[in-house]
Amino acid sequence: VLTAAYVNDLRGAFRVLQVVYGSTSTATTNNTSTFADTTLTASITPQSSSSKVLVMVSQNGCFKSGANAENRMNIRLVRGATTIAKMSGDLFLYTGNAESNGASASISYLDEPATTSATTYKTTFMNPNNTAACIVQEGSAVSTMVLMEISA
């Protein structure tokens, strides 16, 4: 039996407290094995240090240059300066000719930042082959990030 007092206790739990949306369509190139920003970022200031943040990312327009027959791309989700998740271990972009192949990477990640300070999330990418350019947001493809603060 659900009493009024019990329902009242549950009222504050697992509620969405705020939602933040970020997007970019800026084409960005990286031809090194060092992680670089994709320009996709969003910031949230949690209302409680016990809140969780659900991070949902769609990284689009992932292409390789046509100069290399084989290329890979690694994409990471970063909070502040800390990598918190791999979005793609090796997003494999392959073509046997001069044409580029495209792909997308997405992730839903439940984070526990344990802070009430402004917290910034972003994605970074690099080319482990270090031989040809990897591109995100190619052709002005839109990449998006949604941050949802969820009460504990």
Regions found by a protein language model. Give the residues of each.
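Extended, low-complexity regulatory regions
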Residues: L40-A42
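Terminal beta-strand-rich extracellular "head" domains
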Residues: S23, T34, P46-A118, K122-A152
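Low-complexity, glycine/proline/serine-rich flexible segments
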Residues: T29-N31
